């Protein structure tokens, strides 16, 4: 059984305009007991498909849409394609010089809700700001984090 978020009648309008957030007040019910961060199908009250979203039960934004395409699979290849598209845009904007710094992935702007990657020279800083982003973090490369709190 596919896990689902079913919206209240008339609450699909923002999704039809491609807004990626699903607020808790727009949800009629959740079916299938999805885990925090798990990808669910989002449907209108009449059953029409609206998108694939990461589920965040502890947030006011209970769904963050990964894709509005019914045929898209949300897997490692999905994330690779979205990351490659974000990189290609930064290259087009001449933001990829090795000594520079920029925001390589900017969450919803790059169709990766809750994921931010900043680059400062040879260092990358990854922020996972939602349950769906954390749930799918097994797709990220291994890294070493050195944190110094002493100033």
Regions found by a protein language model. Name each.
Residues 1-151:
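RNA-binding accessory domains that recognize and position tRNA/RNA substrates
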